């Protein structure tokens, strides 16, 4: 067989095409690797879409209780429980879960800081918040009396308005200069639930902290706030490690088996946080694809 000088043989053409095919495949594989981690999400538009979803909640909260009713159903619904509401929100942002069920005011606080999230208009459930106290304690009657007075004189409304709405931050509750002959009142809370309780530097602040201070001002106690996991609060009250639990806690039949509750001091509702479909799409997948193509292009130069 005679080969013309400078003209590639069929074998050379074959191997060149084979290398080109592998190069193209490399482009796609590298692009996939760089874009990795982006997966299809279940679209949640209301309660009817929760079946089969990956739901995030804060451990031990009312949201946890209601979400548990979906757990283990035929649709394959799963519940991820987090010690902090912020951790559940972060899991939603990184596509580890499809939605978060949480109280409305903390939800509004989280969404305000994360415009890529939104709260569905459909309410999951409506509830009342109250203070948990050791069973059969005379403190229950004292706290109810103080709450009634604080409601009547507008103090409770002022505290709430200082954290929500257009007047937020303009009317803080100021600790009163009164005698405190009754010692220390220990309040157990979970400072991961803004605006009810959260940390501002070393201090624990929020709606519940202010309400507790107002109650102590009325009853002659010095207030001490102890931060702990939410699901440890009732045990702390039962065992006397804390006098009261104030942590955006709703009254439920299960909790009433272990502690007493004061009269409610506010109403709340559980809502569903999801990804905001109108938020600008993340550039991460595109950047990943470009990076993959760039690496593949460098590889092609070496062929």
Where are these regions (language model features)?
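Extracytoplasmic small-molecule ligand-binding "clamshell" domains
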Residues: 78-82, 90, 182-248
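Acidic, polar ligand-binding/catalytic clefts
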Residues: 41-49, 108, 114-125, 133, ...
